[in-house]
Curated annotation (Swiss-Prot):
It comes from Clostridium botulinum (strain Alaska E43 / Type E3). The lineage of its organism: Bacteria, Bacillati, Bacillota, Clostridia, Eubacteriales. Its main location: cytoplasm. It is found in: Cytoplasm. GO terms for biological process: chaperone cofactor-dependent protein refolding; DNA replication; protein refolding; response to heat. This is Chaperone protein DnaJ.
Amino acid sequence: MANKDYYEVLGLQKGASDDEIKKAFRKLAIKYHPDKNKGNTEAEEKFKEINEAYQVLSDPEKKSNYDQFGSADFNGGGFGSGGFGGFDMGGFGDIFDMFTGGGSSTRRRNGPVNGNDIEYTLTLTFEEAVFGVEKEITVNRSESCEHCNGSGAEPGTSKKTCPTCSGTGQVRVQRQTPLGSFVSTSTCDRCSGTGNIIEKPCTHCRGNGNVRKTRKINVNIPAGVDTGNVMPLRGQGEHGLRGGSPGDLYIRINVSPSKEFTRKGNDIYIDTHISMAKAALGTEITVKTVEGNVKYTVPEGTQSGTLFRLKGKGVARVNSTGKGDQYVRVIVDIPKGLNQKQKEALYTFMEACGEEMDENTHSFKKNLFGRKK
């Protein structure tokens, strides 16, 4: 669902409230539930889309990232303590209990199980984040066993249907209560909910169907990313079981600070120092930018702390056009350890400006010029 609008999937406008999202999900989940639409592949796909949309829009951090970056490149959002594996019903288990007799959590175990998502933190230099870069990363993930093709059974052997649950993965228990007879379902202990018995497990994966593998993956990082951005790589997570879809790999960006530049959003800031005389008279300075040095004319009378803007010299906007700006803060250095000639020049300057001297300054000047004679 890489290019679909999650809000549109739920029939909502962007910016919908949490309550509106929950209500829309509940209504559509009931309408398109596979048990209510047996054999309808279109309804099954719609149900998957609804689940995916709700999984993002119901999580504040994921929703924030999706609203900011869209589904094309950065619709992944943050990571909760439980990771991304599986679909969290978020209090809607009763919807599925309507069709499964209260066994929604166990019912899925004998069918395809989607792979878990993986989180990977990638640290970039300041320059790599500004210009974009291709990185090779190494991830350890669960993959389908090549020896048994993910079946879990040793080649040449096969699984058999569990005789206890007849392949359903569940057992039904009838209980008598003061209120009448109730039927509940639970996971079959004999097959652990898979519905099948493996008589001779695969010698490579020990009947699991998946094995751990270390893979190298090339990641193209677009220009303009910043710390906290999350980039999803669809289908690069852990492999599923029994034909389930693979999870996704989420790249969390961390950018190392620059020794010279400070970044705020798409704008860059840098300090430059000039003398008191140059600040008063004006001067041309050389300013370092991420693209190289540029000349800038500082007007006369510039005060310390003044900001000047270099338009379009900032960071590229991710998934958009244009760049931010660079701001140059001028720091006027006050000289220390003046020699006699420099002090005389400053006293002369004070007199030319008509500044009044206090008693101590006047006495100091008198002694200074007296020593000169």
